[in-house]
A protein has these predicted regions:
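Primarily recognizes the serine-hydrolase "nucleophile elbow" in alpha/beta-hydrolase
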Residues: 193-265
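Short beta-strand/loop motif that positions the catalytic acidic residue
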Residues: 346, 351-358
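Catalytic-loop region of hydrolases
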Residues: 17-116, 437
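C-terminal catalytic histidine-bearing segment of alpha/beta-hydrolase fold enzymes
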Residues: 333-334, 351, 360, 367-458
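Fungal secretory targeting signals
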Residues: 1-29, 458
Length: 458
């Protein structure tokens, strides 16, 4: 789906790249060290036996990340550079899965220089995998291996440069339950609760201004959190949520990407649902053809980039004894429907940005979602971008999202009604253009070793 995102994020620094003849001249590439322990083998991630005794958002344990937070190289993406933060933390906290069972997951807390501890952005990274070892808490670390997540650190750095504390939840939970979106939304909300409970550890205020941001798979968690907030976490006020590349309907995507370069989303999504719903697991066991079962289950061992490469162009409908199973079976359709967007109206103001040429999820479905939100009384600024597709809008839409989030953080944006615009490029938005030069300069300086964060406290 966004398999080239790391390379595309490097476009943020194109204005500076002519000065670089190789990565050796940019910052300090940390010497190789032992990779961080995989979450599947790391006792920190282990759920306690008395999990039910913890309230949602309660912190179970905490630590600094085993390895420094890192960003992918701009020219050679296999290289990684340390992100010079004031502090970083991992919190294991209690949340609730899609079946209303107690579970726990990890929150990464990133603190910039001159942080404003009363402004917190919850950033929902692209995970899109049924493998716990792909979680952002692991993938953000040095020597965790190439990933989309380390490309997204560039976006996170842009937020940190505003002085905001950024929190990044492992919203797919301890089993990698990709597409179990009630879990994802609740994990986001409980991550905010955990952040508010972490003052003695992280310095975060008890009642900070909170915003959300996510793209593609991250937009699912972001919008589900916004939908569930009034009922699941009414005390958690959200000043605004920015969501790009929204995916309102799961079954549509499963059918649309079959046989394309994004076909790897199918086994990852089906296996992710199986990790939450036993009936989906039973369907896989019964209907995946024996000669394809080992290959299908490879998705449980790989992350997004691996799945994209492994299954690119393959017709996954031919892996099962009923070609319509993956997107027409009544059980799959029912469970997928339970995890579609558009079930509750968000109270938080929304920025939704979507490519009209989105090749993963049709723009018409996001049009319908926004229309439904607005009819339910939500406040949505909706930007339809004519110049991009699903992948490229992840990059070109980021400056506008950042500018909008800054307005929400500062209480400057007082939009009270829905507004839809079809534009050539959201990158040409006045707010995006105003913020872009500083974003580019900060990103360049961060890569060459500047401490991340504003020079003065705002």
């Amino acid at each position: 789906m966004i398999s080239t995102m790391i390379c595309q994020l490097a476009l943020w620094l194109t204005l500076f790249s002519w000065t670089i003849s190789g990565d050796a001249g940019v910052g300090a590439v940390l010497e190789a060290r032992a990779p961080p322990p995989l979450p599947s083998a790391d006792g920190f991630y282990k759920l306690p036996d008395n999990l039910d005794s913890y309230a949602p958002g309660a912190i179970i344990r905490h630590r600094p990340p085993p390895n420094p937070i890192a960003v992918a190289g701009l020219i050679h993406s296999q290289n990684q550079y340390p992100v010079h933060l004031d502090a970083s933390y991992q919190l294991l906290y209690r949340t609730t899965d899609s079946l209303n069972n107690a579970t726990a997951t990890v929150l990464t807390v990133l603190v910039p220089r001159n942080a404003n501890f009363n402004k917190v952005l919850s950033y929902q990274a692209v995970d899109d995998a049924s493998n716990i070892n792909c979680a952002p808490s692991y993938a953000f670390q040095l020597d965790s291996g190439p990933s989309v997540a380390q490309g997204e650190v560039l976006l996170v750095e842009a937020a940190l440069e505003q002085g905001w504390v950024v929190i990044v939840p492992d919203y797919l939970g301890p089993k990698g339950a990709f597409l179990a979106n009630a879990l994802a939304g609740q994990a986001v909300l409980d991550g905010i609760r955990a952040a508010r409970n972490s003052g003695a550890i992280t310095g975060i205020g008890k009642n900070p201004t909170v915003t959300l941001w996510g793209y593609s798979g991250g937009s699912l968690a972001t919008l589900f959190a916004a939908e569930l907030q009034p009922s699941y976490a009414p005390e958690v006020a959200i000043a605004g949520a920015a969501a790009g590349g929204a995916v309102p309907n799961i079954t549509t995507v499963l059918g649309k990407v079959d046989g394309t370069g994004a076909a790897g989303l199918i086994p990852a999504g089906i296996l992710g649902l199986a990790h939450q719903y036993p009936e989906v697991d039973a369907l896989i066991q019964k209907h995946v053809l024996p000669q394809h079962k080992d290959e299908f289950y490879k998705a449980d061992k790989m992350c997004l980039l691996g799945n994209i490469n492994e299954f690119s162009g393959k017709n996954l409908s031919q892996f099962v004894d009923d070609p319509s199973l993956l997107y027409a079976n009544p059980t799959v359709v029912r469970i997928a429907g339970e995890n579609d967007l558009g079930q509750h109206a968000p109270k938080a103001p929304l920025l939704v940005y979507k490519a009209t040429k989105d090749e993963v999820s049709p723009v018409a479905e996001t049009d319908a979602l926004v229309d439904w939100y607005c009819k339910q009384g939500a406040t949505v600024q909706y930007l339809r971008d004519e110049s991009t597709n699903h992948e490229s809008l992840a990059v070109t839409g980021a400056p506008k999202a950042l500018a909008w989030l800054r307005g929400r953080m500062n209480g400057e944006d007082h939009q009270t009604a829905c507004e839809t615009k079809t534009v050539y490029s959201v990158l040409l938005d006045f707010g995006a253009l105003a913020i872009l030069p500083k974003v580019l300069l900060d990103a360049f300086l961060d890569v060459i070793g500047k401490r991340v964060g504003p020079f003065i406290k705002w």
